[in-house]
Amino acid sequence: MNRNNQNEYEVIDAPHCGCPADDVVKYPLTDDPNAGLQNMNYKEYLQTYGGDYTDPLINPNLSVSGKDVIQVGINIVGRLLSFFGFPFSSQWVTVYTYLLNSLWPDDENSVWDAFMERVEELIDQKISEAVKGRALDDLTGLQYNYNLYVEALDEWLNRPNGARASLVSQRFNILDSLFTQFMPSFGSGPGSQNYATILLPVYAQAANLHLLLLKDADIYGARWGLNQTQIDQFHSRQQSLTQTYTNHCVTAYNDGLAELRGTTAESWFKYNQYRREMTLTAMDLVALFPYYNLRQYPDGTNPQLTREVYTDPIAFDPLEQPTTQLCRSWYINPAFRNHLNFSVLENSLIRPPHLFERLSNLQILVNYQTNGSAWRGSRVRYHYLHSSIIQEKSYGLLSDPVGANINVQNNDIYQIISQVSNFASPVGSSYSVWDTNFYLSSGQVSGISGYTQQGIPAVCLQQRNSTDELPSLNPEGDIIRNYSHRLSHITQYRFQATQSGSPSTVSANLPTCVWTHRDVDLDNTITANQITQLPLVKAYELSSGATVVKGPGFTGGDVIRRTNTGGFGAIRVSVTGPLTQRYRIRFRYASTIDFDFFVTRGGTTINNFRFTRTMNRGQESRYESYRTVEFTTPFNFTQSQDIIRTSIQGLSGNGEVYLDRIEIIPVNPAREAEEDLEAAKKAARQNLFTRTRDGLQVNVTDYQVDQAANLVSCLSDEQYGHDKKMLLEAVRAAKRLSRERNLLQDPDFNTINSTEENGWKASNGVTISEGGPFFKGRALQLASARENYPTYIYQKVDASVLKPYTRYRLDGFVKSSQDLEIDLIHYHKVHLVKNVPDNLVSDTYSDGSCSGMNRCEEQQMVNAQLETEHHHPMDCCEAAQTHEFSSYINTGDLNASVDQGIWVVLKVRTTDGYATLGNLELVEVGPLSGESLEREQRDNAKWNAELGRKRAEIDRVYLAAKQAINHLFVDYQDQQLNPEIGLAEINEASNLVESISGVYSDTLLQIPGINYEIYTELSDRLQQASYLYTSRNAVQNGDFNSGLDSWNTTTDASVQQDGNMHFLVLSHWDAQVSQQLRVNPNCKYVLRVTARKVGGGDGYVTIRDGAHHQETLTFNACDYDVNGTYVNDNSYITEEVVFYPETKHMWVEVSESEGSFYIDSIEFIETQE
């Protein structure tokens, strides 16, 4: 359309009226955009710019049939495929108009009604009138409001100003809200979900309209006045709804298949019809949902629908069944009941998944009869894309002569018209195919002919036309220009048998045509101006060990699976752009296991990276099971015909890897530089700071600040020098704010195990690494534990810097770890375990700098990996594998009587564990409120009550232990031991001290508990008593804590242990233990022995000096204690005797007469007169 001698491509947003264009901004374009539209076939028809082709292809004055809704489904998909090949622009307004006119051709709901009626017919089930009425009413509301939105959008695009922008934004929001409200009426809500299968085409078409709408927020949102946060929210909703809508459609589709799966030929016929028609009206559309992601496909792309559809077998099937037994549809003929069933037809006519094929040659084998040539066999020759190897499949009777030899070569067979019959008589029934014409895109018509109508009633004859089931894109125009599918294969099932108990015979020949979408690019063309889709099934070669398997329903075709190390296949591509053009590779996969992915071009590895699993083994594939990831290292092709191979290595166990497609993305340095600048601005300004720019957003982590700094550092100095300078100032300010709010001391790990009270305390095995590709600052490395000695590092955040009833968050980044335990301890503990795979392996190479790494490309790759973690729904096990982590803990009332800080503990307790992590920070999130505050107050009150109870108990134990220790000394300074006490009293006091609980943290023994101070006080005094006791005892190792050191023994003597108690055991009458002592002659000594005798006989402890003076303490089982109480075999008693040695050398000897003798301690101490 021209106005004032101006072409539309010269003026963006040119108004369509004749009024002055005062508010139109003119932009000169370097290239005529029409140049890219030359030499187009049916897409030229679809892409025409005027309004001529926004009208429906269904006559609104006629009723809408089942074939019509198939026509609508094919046309909508074809229209979208055409427009996906161009950048998103105002041209999409014509798509809106086309879709609305196609779905509401008469401004009524006849098409939507026909969608439901067709599925009702296929599955033989009726939808509730109430559900149907509600759905149609809601569709009417959507139509009205969609028209209002498109009208406002078109007016704003042609005459942009603030008022029109406000109006279109308002109508956008209203329409989005209505879709959110009405979508449950189409099969996902509680009132309609029982009819989800019947409503599947309705749901898919409505979902498509909603996702198509949401993409406009990315295209126009900023010009409407939306801020970036609002635009991002719409984008996130678009992605989330893509997942929701896709999963619903796949479930409804599969439920319908399961419901139709039966045992008879008729059930198979309906099953195949449902499979084909739901593919054309719903599932093809679902496969296009991801391509509305403007951020992923900014320059357009070429979606490839590689799926196959099977038209009905070419056999007699009248629209109305006769009342007689003659001339009935083949699948309900009772004579075939014993020969045709569901499984026979499915296994004979439907091929297993395979690589995408192109038909090369077709031979029809015929039997010449009086009626003409009957089709009885087929030879199908085909090849994989860009393969010179011809494959061949044969079906039916192969001994018959060739009636037609059709060389397809580089043409398409787009239509097949056949004459079919059911010759029925008392002697048998036969279904035959006679005249058949194959229409080629070259204009040639080939086939078998010569049929004469002899002996067959007209009612038993029928013409079958493939376009009745696969309509062309424009039924009013030439099919040769507008066909939608091309023939890719013909399967066939033929049988002939004699009926049981009858001389009559039955026979049938059932050729079945297999079709692929015409839009599939048969050359795998790589262009320099848009993203190229390469489904892996378009390979010319399948690697050994790789298997083509049925797709999950939303990929538009089958996928390739691999369960071990090796390749997937090889794709030959045709490069049309200059060989200097650089590209990047993106691919879509699902996996139950971690793996290394390799891409080679012409034998040279261009990318490799380690990727993580996306689902659990045995789990059903859903939309979220498939992940799209991108390599950052660019490459270029070296020849116009090149080969891309993909393979996997380094599988972490048994599992499955599914590969859907790879995408070839042209690198546009200028645009990517602009995108880098916008990403840096977003990271440095919008994502870090609060609105007032005086603080960091609460959810921002120190790691994110560092990564924002990396993004800014990677900006070009030449192009964006000023922007870079300002953004660097911003991220430096953000880093300072990050440090100021961090409650951890020394977050850079400059000093460990310092003498300061707080700060980092660590065990052996903790090292600090400097720099590296994953951390801008220092990082911690924790080695594996040694037997019972964990590797740990911890720090206490003092209570003085904390606030009561406030939430705090520990953030960090883990490069990789195994069995890393992260604990936050306050009055309660928050425990986190991280098992993070070492999958951040770069596919980049050195940039020649002294650091030896290209941090810019490195960061892009890391960000791509982290992006999958952020958007992939995870269970608790998967969350433990994420690199970034945050752990939250709430404070209570900060009871002043307890030293309530927050302990941050990192440890590895296993011998095969390890960890590398950094960017640790403990930050205040904010005060608790509402239910969180009430819950914390209740928990804190319970803890305080329990603390009071424990303290009362500990106070009782503390008082008893303190009194027992006081009794050990004769002075207040604990410098002199009470001469009356012995080891038994010390052990008794020790047992009381050890009964104090809460001395150390359960997490790490190096962390003191709430009773650590009183325990330390008593332990120090007890240690003093033990020292004084050992010092005064002339007997060395008299408590046997060092085994038999210092003692002379026979073989029948040993030292045993019971808890903290060691005791000497003599278990035979000839056992003997002795020790020589040095003493002060003529001084008073006391020999004190604590022991017990078991069994008969006596036990003896004898002391003697060099003058042959001696004293003996005797123990037996009949001993009484000092109070006259009987002592049993399990009780120890203490005996003592005074001795005045006359020489400085003495000897102590231990022996027994029979039984066993247990000695707890032997003392020989000097006492005051």
UniProtKB/Swiss-Prot annotation:
CDD domains: delta_endotoxin_C (cd04085). InterPro entries: Cry1Ac-like_dom-VII, Cry_V, Galactose-bd-like_sf, Pest_crys, Pest_crys_dom-III, Pest_crys_dom_I, Pest_crys_N_sf, Pest_cryst_cen_dom_sf. It comes from the Bacteria. Keywords: Sporulation, Toxin, Virulence. Coiled coil: none annotated. GO terms for biological process: sporulation resulting in formation of a cellular spore; symbiont-mediated killing of host cell. One of its GO terms (molecular function) is toxin activity. Toxic segment of the protein is located in the N-terminus. PANTHER family: ENDOTOXIN_N DOMAIN-CONTAINING PROTEIN-RELATED, PESTICIDAL CRYSTAL PROTEIN N-TERMINAL DOMAIN-CONTAINING PROTEIN. Promotes colloidosmotic lysis by binding to the midgut epithelial cells of insects. Belongs to the delta endotoxin family. This is Pesticidal crystal protein Cry9Da.
